[in-house]
Design a protein with these regions (language model features):
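Short, flexible helix-loop junctions that flank or precede catalytic/ligand sites
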Residues: 1-381
Length: 381
């Protein structure tokens, strides 16, 4: 019997996998709870089977593009099963594929175990919010949850620009248009420029990949729109530095001012293994653009202080570092101590905190919190 991509995807969904990996000469592999596992009862894939499965998901235009570029991103749906994000590529002269399972249900902030401040960020009416992390860290899932929260609570016009469209949003209180790159529009920057003429309240840009897209996103946020996007950065400090570095040196001072004026929050996340072995849970760093943080963005010599400011802003602003997030997950018994220590930026300090021993970092955080409070009072005058 011919190997069917739909049957393999059904196996992926049944096994609660996040991804399906296909390679000529190998059994299919599933990524379950972060680990790759072969489906050994399925025969090794032949070149002909791989090409047939890949082409069965493509339109004629997509087939032509793949033949020309040997790379293709697309979305694929199976009735009664779900939607999948597909990347098709060439490796060692053969076709390879990775298919990401897109959950059919958009989960809430609470269901995703995201910190409560995320819900507050969704109440912002204008500005820029960035969700960052490595590939597979759950950025799209978090963004979908935030957009769905706005959709349920505000009568807004929401435009999403994605490559490809992943989560399908249905109109609730809001009116949503979803546009897919190379299907509904040429690219992110073109769609974003056009979107400014479509009376939007909220714009989701799937990824800020280039200078033009970043510039237009900043302009959109500056002119009174709420803009959400993603970057492949590890934390808030790297995110700020990455955006600034995209621009030529003569423009960077102005971009710092523009970014400080528009940025509302940076949410960076990593997935860590649950203590009950039932999947993974996000460890999340949250930076809120307070007056002190804005000053750190404007002044290049102070950008390095952003991490310390996040650590000091927990009680007043709801900010948190990755290590603070890990500590919270550990105290809630969602992750094990071994998992927390293996993921912590400073394992020694983490151990001291568990033991209730005050560290030099605690004193530094208190001093930073005092400086931030003084700065905020001065900024309000």
């Amino acid at each position: 019997m011919a190997l069917s991509i739909d049957d393999l995807l059904r196996r992926a969904v049944e096994n609660k996998s996040s991804d399906l990996h296909l390679k000529v000469g190998n059994h299919p592999y599933l990524r379950v709870d972060g680990l790759l596992t072969p489906i050994t009862d399925v025969p090794r894939i032949t070149p002909e089977e791989m090409l047939s499965m890949a082409f069965s998901m493509m339109t004629n235009r997509q087939k032509q593009k793949f033949k020309e570029t040997a790379e293709l991103d697309m979305a694929y749906g199976v009735a009664g099963l779900g939607r999948f994000r597909v990347n098709v590529f060439q490796q060692r002269g053969n076709v390879g594929m990775v298919l990401r399972v897109i959950p059919t249900k958009i989960r809430t902030v609470e269901e995703l175990n995201l910190p409560p401040v995320i819900s507050k960020i969704c109440e912002e009416q204008r500005g820029l919010v960035l969700v960052t992390g490595t590939t597979g860290s759950g950025k799209s899932t978090t963004l979908a949850s935030m957009i769905d929260r706005i959709n349920a609570n505000r009568a807004d016009h929401i435009i999403t620009i994605e490559d490809p469209i992943e989560f399908l949003h249905r109109d609730k209180r809001s009116f949503i248009n979803q546009r897919e790159v190379e299907v509904d529009t040429a690219n992110f920057s073109t769609a974003l420029r056009a979107g400014l003429r479509q009376d939007p309240d909220v714009i989701l840009v799937g990824e800020m990949r280039d200078l033009e897209t970043i510039s237009t996103a900043l302009l959109a946020a500056e002119t009174g729109h709420m803009v959400f996007s993603t970057l492949h950065t590890l934390d808030a400090t790297e995110t700020i530095q990455r955006i600034i570095a995209v621009f030529p040196p003569p423009e960077q001072k102005q971009i710092r001012l523009q970014l400080a004026a528009t940025l509302k929050a940076v949410v960076s996340q990593r997935l860590v293994r649950r203590a009950d072995d039932k999947g993974r849970v996000p460890a999340v760093e949250v930076m809120i653009a307070t007056a002190y943080i804005k000053d750190c963005i404007i002044n290049a010599d102070k950008t390095r202080l952003i991490h310390d400011a996040i650590a000091a802003g927990t009680s007043q602003y709801g900010m948190q570092t990755f290590d603070q997030s890990l500590f919270d997950l550990y105290t809630k018994e969602l992750i094990t101590l071994d998992e927390a220590l293996s993921r912590a930026s400073n394992a020694d300090e983490f151990k001291l905190r568990i033991q209730g021993i005050r560290s030099a970092a605690d004193a530094a955080r208190e001093e930073m919190a005092s400086q931030m409070a003084d700065f905020e009072r001065f900024a309000r005058k």
